Amino acid sequence: MSRMACKLSYDGTAFAGYQVQPGKRTVQSEVERALQEIHKGARVPVVASGRTDAGVHACGQVLHFDTELTIAPERWVSALNTHLPDDIVVTNAAMVEPDFHARYGAQAKEYRYYIQCGPFENVFRRHFAVHIKQALDVPAMQTAAKHLLGTHDFSAFCAANTTVTDKVRTITHVAVQPSEEGLLISIRGTGFLYNMVRIIVGTLLEIGTGKRVASEMKVILAGKSRNLAGKTAPAHGLCLYEVDYGQPLFVNETPGQVSMN
């Protein structure tokens, strides 16, 4: 029995999220269906680095599964892609140690949120970037984002219906930078709460549009209440960009190998 790790990109538009849900199309169900076909009907469960919500994309999702088949990593890539739908692509594969765990072994994750700015929406990007008509105060957003760095209780930036009790997380990098189409917000941390990135982005957008001032970010963090933060930003602007395991998993690995840019 061997343990394989795979890197996935997927367009989340037509999925009800990553995790299996009865009667709904999900990324996990499609991957497990493909593996079942390759294994001649035998069920092969997969474990991912984490779940993504309906409409959220990924270019750096990582999963693992156990197999009795003797197939080279590069052949796993082609075999899986042959059986997967067009909106999921395996971009890399590797044989890993038996104790490797895609979820519990992850040391950090990076998410990126894409924003179109301007009077007209680029219809070819409408499923991958959120459109904001008004001009954004980028320096104010950058100032506010700095308050997120470090270890904090992120209760204010967590969905109210979560069952998680420990809401302390560490953010190691956050950037708000102009891009060709508008704005790119990237956030890297050791772990994230449910809807955390989207609530942070929603709050930053309210600061960028003048509904709030940059100094409010510090107050919101200290208040630890979901009611203090901004709205949850739409799912389709978000992409799981990279999962870091402390050392490269794959040959010729580069972050964001299939880019959303």
UniProtKB/Swiss-Prot annotation:
- Which UniProt keywords are present, listed alphabetically? Isomerase, tRNA processing
Q: Supply the source organism's classification.
A: Bacteria, Bacillati, Bacillota, Bacilli, Bacillales
Transmembrane segment boundaries:
none
User: EC number(s)?
Assistant: 5.4.99.12
Catalytic residues, chain numbering:
53
Which protein family is named in the record? Answer: Belongs to the tRNA pseudouridine synthase TruA family.
Has UniProt tagged this entry with the keyword Isomerase?
yes
State the Gene Ontology terms under molecular function.
RNA binding; tRNA pseudouridine(38-40) synthase activity
> Does the keyword field hold Repeat?
no
Catalytic activity annotation: uridine(38/39/40) in tRNA = pseudouridine(38/39/40) in tRNA
The record describes its quaternary structure and partners as:
Homodimer.
- Lineage, top-rank taxon, reads Bacteria
Biological process terms from the Gene Ontology for this record are: tRNA pseudouridine synthesis
Report what the protein is called: tRNA pseudouridine synthase A
Q: What class of enzyme is it?
A: isomerase
- Alphabetical list of NCBIfam families matching this protein: hisT_truA (TIGR00071)
Chain sites annotated for binding substrate: 111
Give a short account of what the protein does: Formation of pseudouridine at positions 38, 39 and 40 in the anticodon stem and loop of transfer RNAs.
Among PANTHER family, the record links this protein to:
PSEUDOURIDYLATE SYNTHASE (PTHR11142), TRNA PSEUDOURIDINE SYNTHASE-LIKE 1 (PTHR11142:SF0)
